[in-house]
């Protein structure tokens, strides 16, 4: 509790993905005042041509707090 799921285009190396995960975890620790073992983070790479069917169609607009040019 909670789990953060990141979906993004391919191309980042493992070190960058690890840094993304650690930064997200650290911010949640700070914001929620909870220890690291409360949070899990996954990163899934999605090809641009599969983005709409894999990501955009699955995101519930009521759950979307920040939009982007790709997911609105």
Q: Language-model segments: which ranges?
A:
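A domain-level signal for the structural core that forms small-molecule/cofactor-binding pockets
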Residues: 2-72
């Amino acid at each position: 509790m909670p789990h953060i799921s990141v979906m993004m285009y391919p191309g980042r190396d493992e070190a960058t993905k690890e840094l993304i995960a650690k930064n997200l975890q650290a911010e949640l620790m700070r914001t929620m005042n909870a220890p690291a073992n409360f949070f899990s983070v996954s990163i899934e790479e999605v090809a641009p041509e599969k983005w709409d069917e894999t990501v955009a169609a699955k995101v519930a607009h009521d759950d979307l707090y920040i939009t982007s040019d790709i997911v609105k």
